[in-house]
Amino acid sequence: MTTLPRYAVFGNPVAHSKSPQIHRQFALQEGVDIEYERICADIGGFAQAVSTFFETGGCGANVTVPFKQEAFDLADEHSERALAAGAVNTLILLKNGKLRGDNTDGIGLANDITQVKNIAIEDKTILLLGAGGAVRGVIPVLKEHRPARIVITNRTHAKAEELARLFGIEAVPMADLNGGFDIIINGTSGGLSGQLPAVSPEIFRDCRLAYDMVYGEAALAFLNFAQSNGAAEVSDGLGMLVGQAAASYHIWRGFTPDIRPVIEYMKAL
């Protein structure tokens, strides 16, 4: 059995995950060796897979689709962020043997926007497209940055209204949207199949940044749509991915990685 600190990402599917490469770069910055693996848990077998991992020397884990809600249920303790998000993407085994769950997605998004792209969230008007778990997970941290206004919209308006009530933000039907948004964040899953949110091109006319929470080819349709209709800057979610990973790494090891060189490294792969 390895004596190196062991970490893993759990998902299904998970073979595509870039987390091992990212965390390897963080370990190089810290000057340590770690082991980081991908674990594809069976649907219905997540809890057992996590239990086995920690019982055999695991120190910390990332959790991706479709297990973030199960990870929340599995955790013995939760951070305030995780409680607000209702989902967990980071697990750490505490010295007392309990599992603590955290959610670093919002930190990853906010740090990419404010620190890497140097765009302030404070006093800005933000539009969130989508009302699923990905969007819910980032709202608490966005609110901490004190934007002037957060508007949420979704194909099924009732879901947007539900999150609006939960977090004290505004819900507006997609058909009623027009311009006036500084930052537009796409958290819908349509890009994975090339589909665009059913919004007017007019929403981008005042847009400083259009951001897709997914990365790579899946983000291209939305980003091209935004840029061609007036968005000053567009970005996929690679920086969010690296940023949330860095926050997880800090929770596990107390070391804060510099995300900028890792983002550039991942772009070059």
From Swiss-Prot:
Shikimate binds at S17, K18, S19, T64, N89, D105, Y215. Homodimer. Coiled coil: none annotated. This is Shikimate dehydrogenase (NADP(+)). GO terms for biological process: amino acid biosynthetic process; aromatic amino acid family biosynthetic process; chorismate biosynthetic process; shikimate metabolic process. Its EC number is 1.1.1.25. InterPro entries: Aminoacid_DH-like_N_sf, NAD(P)-bd_dom_sf, SDH_C, Shikimate_DH, Shikimate_DH-bd_N, Shikimate_DH_fam, Shikm_DH/Glu-tRNA_Rdtase. It comes from the Bacteria. GO terms for molecular function: NADP binding; shikimate 3-dehydrogenase (NADP+) activity. The gene is aroE. It catalyses: shikimate + NADP(+) = 3-dehydroshikimate + NADPH + H(+). Keywords: Amino-acid biosynthesis, Aromatic amino acid biosynthesis, NADP, Oxidoreductase. It is an enzyme of class 1 (oxidoreductase). CDD domains: NAD_bind_Shikimate_DH.
